[in-house]
């Protein structure tokens, strides 16, 4: 009996020692192994939540479209119902953002950049539910927004959540897990692991602290999120455009011309985004009722637009293969391009929870395809394929607007599985970036972050001025 008791006590002591060792390992902030393990956890969680977000948005969209199909034969019901359903869904997203987590509005990528510099708060307990449910509303309503921005912000906030749950106190761990979550989020949104890594290194280069531990953590998180994505969605490219032909050397100058066009379009697009943001701010003045009603009106209009021309509504992933295949005329491509520019400005600049990556990729595809079709008519001797210009255009607008050409190139190649077009992609994106920089254009996300920080400083200064007055009272 005594032997059994002593054996049991010995086993208990061993278990307690193991638990103590694991706890100490997790609490040693400078242990690379602990950070890498946490990065794997962050990547896995981000992949799971990213897939869940994608499925949830698709479910809401299918439910909305299914309700419209039921009344498709009754025009007097169809049009009002399309407006009302999309308006109500959009209002849910706008209300949640404005009421509970204003930092969850828009793409969320500038918020992650600010958090990496310790300039913006990371309230993951608010942002995660608001961004997820709010994004279901706005994206499910058919608004011209993408899911990549929300997934990046969700990933970054999951990184901070894991840090807080495991009580890792070091600044290095805090910074690394936030960046890891953001990279894993982009990878989970686009099934583009290398683009997720490059996005952190290139787009967030002023904020990202590049060292051996941080880059290994980012790699680990991205690998895990990509594995999770492929378990649920398979390994096929996220955008199916088929295998396109190579670009002959004697046609490469046309891609430089296309890059020059996007180099002009990019700064203009950024300027329009910022001006539209100012217009909306003047309209609602921060008043929640006006803001929600405005969002509902925009969502309802997107619902109506989806009936008139489905290609002009939604994030754009369904539009890209159709446009790249040359199924539209040049005139219709330009019409859809202009329409989607307007709807992108209205949806994104109004502060709806949703990203701008996917809409920009769709815009680049439309303009690139139109250019390719026109070039095929003007230069029949080249036997040009418009789809190759569509692929080049996808990354070019992003390169000119966000000022991340390498990310744009790799992202598009991973999404379409057309790696043979890497040379024309480089020429187009480099030309677009250089001209945009020469024209004085500023990177979109950095500019939005600067405006957010200026507003934050102004609000803090106002509070400091009011504090003495309140004390005297």
Curated annotation (Swiss-Prot):
Motif (Selectivity filter part_3): 355-359
Stretches within the membrane that do not traverse it: 109-116, 177-189, 190-192, 193-201, 387-401, 402-404, 405-416, 417-421
Entry GO terms, CC: plasma membrane
Principal subcellular localization: membrane
Membrane topology per record: Multi-pass membrane protein
Residues that, per the record, bind chloride: 107, 356-357, 445
Subcellular location as annotated: Cell inner membrane
Transmembrane regions: 33-69, 77-100, 124-141, 148-166, 215-232, 253-281, 288-308, 330-349, 355-378, 422-438
Pfam families (UniProt xref): Voltage_CLC (PF00654)
Residues on Cytoplasmic side: 1-32, 117-123, 167-176, 202-214, 282-287, 350-354, 439-473
Annotated positions for site Mediates proton transfer from the outer aqueous phase to the interior of the protein: 148
HAMAP family recorded: CLC_ClcA (MF_01128)
Function of the molecule: Proton-coupled chloride transporter. Functions as antiport system and exchanges two chloride ions for 1 proton. Probably acts as an electrical shunt for an outwardly-directed proton pump that is linked to amino acid decarboxylation, as part of the extreme acid resistance (XAR) response.
NCBIfam families xref list: PRK05277.1
Record protein name field: H(+)/Cl(-) exchange transporter ClcA
Naturally occurring in which organism (per UniProt): Salmonella typhimurium (strain LT2 / SGSC1412 / ATCC 700720)
Gene: clcA
């Amino acid at each position: 009996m005594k032997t059994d008791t002593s054996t049991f006590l010995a086993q208990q002591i061993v278990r307690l020692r193991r638990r103590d060792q694991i706890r100490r390992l997790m609490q040693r902030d400078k242990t690379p192994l602990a950070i890498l393990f946490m990065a794997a956890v962050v990547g896995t969680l981000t992949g799971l939540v990213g897939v869940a977000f994608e499925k949830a948005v698709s479910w809401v969209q299918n439910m909305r479209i299914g309700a419209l199909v039921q009344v498709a034969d009754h025009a007097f019901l169809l049009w009002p119902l399309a407006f009302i359903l999309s308006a109500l869904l959009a209002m849910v997203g706008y209300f949640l953002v404005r009421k509970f987590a204003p930092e969850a509005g828009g793409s969320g990528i500038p918020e992650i950049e600010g958090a990496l510099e310790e300039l913006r708060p990371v309230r993951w307990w608010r942002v995660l539910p608001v961004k997820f449910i709010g994004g279901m509303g706005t994206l499910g309503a058919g608004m011209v927004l993408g899911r990549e921005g929300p997934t990046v912000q969700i990933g970054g906030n999951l990184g901070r959540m894991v840090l807080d749950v495991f009580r890792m106190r070091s600044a290095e761990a805090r910074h690394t897990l936030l960046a890891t979550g953001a990279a894993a989020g982009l990878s989970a949104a686009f099934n583009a692991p290398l683009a997720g890594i490059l996005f952190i290194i290139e787009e967030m280069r002023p904020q990202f602290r590049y060292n051996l531990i941080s880059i290994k953590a980012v790699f680990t998180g991205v690998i895990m999120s990509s594995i999770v994505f492929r378990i649920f969605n398979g390994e096929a490219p996220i955008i199916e455009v088929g295998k396109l032909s190579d670009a002959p050397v004697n046609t490469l100058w046309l891609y430089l011309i296309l890059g020059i066009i996007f180099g002009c379009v990019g700064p203009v697009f950024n300027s329009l985004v910022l001006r539209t943001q100012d217009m909306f701010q003047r309209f609602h003045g921060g008043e929640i009722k006006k803001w929600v009603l405005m969002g509902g009106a925009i969502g309802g209009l997107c619902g109506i637009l989806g009936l008139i021309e489905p290609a002009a509504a939604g994030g754009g992933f369904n539009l890209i293969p159709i446009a790249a295949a040359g199924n539209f005329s040049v005139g219709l491509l330009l019409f859809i391009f202009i329409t989607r520019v307007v709807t992108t400005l209205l949806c994104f600049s109004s502060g709806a929870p949703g990203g701008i990556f996917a809409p920009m990729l769709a815009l680049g595809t439309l303009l690139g395809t139109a250019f390719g079709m026109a070039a095929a008519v003007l230069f029949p001797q080249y036997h040009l394929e418009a789809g190759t210009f569509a692929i080049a255009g996808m990354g070019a607008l992003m390169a000119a607007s966000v000022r991340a050409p390498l990310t744009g190139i790799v992202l598009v190649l991973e999404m379409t599985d057309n790696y043979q077009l890497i040379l024309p992609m480089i020429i187009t994106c480099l030309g677009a970036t250089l001209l945009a920089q020469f024209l004085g254009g500023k990177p979109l996300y950095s500019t939005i972050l600067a405006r957010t920080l200026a507003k934050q400083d102004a609000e803090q200064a106002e509070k400091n001025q009011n504090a003495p007055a309140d004390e005297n009272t």
